[in-house]
Amino acid sequence: NAENLISLRGKIDLVAGGPPCQGFSMAGRRVENDSRNDLINSYINFIDLVQPKLIFFENVRGFTQGFKRNDKKGRAYSLYVIDELEKKGYTVQGHLINFADYGVPQKRTRFILVGIQNQFVESNPTLTKETFFERIVKNKEEFLVSKDLTVNPTLENAISDLLQSNGEVESETPRFKAGIYGDKASD
């Protein structure tokens, strides 16, 4: 209930997540009146009740694009969320990120939103000199090298070390590899 959530104020540093993406996805039945789209208001209400220091929000690219009829919000939901979080006292930045550029084996661009309570931005001016997303781009190469990652890896590349370190077992599916994950099973 709301009282329990309010009691968490000052104790929560980060809320990470976002509402279901199905109603916004360009890959599915993108429908503005999908009832799951209204969960964005529950998310905003949750943020307002808990008041975390930081917000990390993720959704599909379609979240940044308006619907044809635009009868509900009149614009892209991403702009609505940014406006609402700014009203609640957050400095907010949103950006589309292709995670394959950062070594993730999937070719899906996602909308990422980062919010920081205004009081923390005001007390730490270095937070406003360079945005979160500028730092990601600037440090991308160093990150990839430090994690031994490549841009646009295949799934096989990404998990191949699992097979090498723990061994393979014969797969029942033709052309598939099966591995032993975690500790090797003892005989």
Predicted features along the sequence, with ranges:
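Core alpha/beta nucleotide-donor-binding catalytic domains of modification enzymes
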Residues: 1-54, 60-79, 86
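A short acidic, often aromatic-flanked loop/helix-cap motif at beta-alpha or helix-coil junctions
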Residues: 2-4, 100-104
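A short, glycine/Asx- and small/polar-enriched loop/turn
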Residues: 8, 105-110
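Short catalytic/ligand-binding loop motif for oxyanion handling, primarily in non-cytosolic enzymes
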Residues: 22-26, 63-66, 103-107, 120-124
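Secondary-structure boundary elements
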Residues: 49, 53, 84-91, 116-127
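An acidic- and aromatic-residue-enriched active-site/binding cleft used to recognize and process polar
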Residues: 60, 97, 118
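Conserved S-adenosyl-L-methionine
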Residues: 90-101
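S-adenosyl-L-methionine-dependent DNA methyltransferase catalytic core
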Residues: 110-187
